[in-house]
Amino acid sequence: IYNITVKKQAPKKSEIKQFTKFYKECFIKSSKEMGNDWYAEGDDFLHDKWIEWDDYGYIRGMSLEAKEILTEINLPWFKKIQYFGSVTGNNLKSIDLGNNPTLKYFFLDVGYGESAEEGNYPYLNKIDFSGCQNLEGVYINSVFNIKQIDLSNNRKIKTVNISHTPLDELKMPKTDCLKEFYMNWSRINELDLSNCTNIQKIGIIGCNPQSVTISLGNKTDKEISEFDIDVYSADVETSVRFVANREISEVPKVRYEYGYLGYIDGGLDFLRNCI
């Protein structure tokens, strides 16, 4: 684990180069210990692809691929971070988001060429988002031991995409910011979106149990008719029941397609926004 501490006060210009050099040395050393030889020392690949800095040497964003080295992430070290992401983070045991009012995007994903069945993040069972008041996007893919996610305090969230993560419970905030919600292969059988007053897109793919009830709250027929709803089932039949203070027998514009709207609209676009 490399503990990277940034000074609270803005550093001098001469210190910025020292910070940058230190960050790069840490990640180059991590890559060497992993046996990676695709980089060349002295290249600016860390600045362009992995880490971004602001004018004062603070880390603005980070994307990790170290599979064996990193076991815990403590984001309170990074006082001005805007996004954090990890792929192939199979040994991660904890992610402490701390009180990060600047964090906007968070994602966990599988590594390149890896399948969702390879036991990604086997030790990670909790992520606390409560201190991230400006969080706008969450993308979580193939985290098999997280059973509960609480987003109830994240009232500025715009996109939620949770894939191949067998949740038992998902708590949503009271907000008019959330526009897109996508979920697949969870164990949730009841989902309350009644407090998400401005939601526009919902994507649901094969869940276990195969019947999911989604509460839309006090929505009018006109509001519901303008929803973009995608229900897709691959190996098993998926039944989604929508209720809005009454049972809705037929929701206009529901699309049953071969393909998952959530991955296309929520996943890839979200990752492009982050990196």
Give the residues covered by each predicted segment:
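Conserved positional slot within leucine-rich repeat
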Residues: 63, 74, 85-86, 96, ...
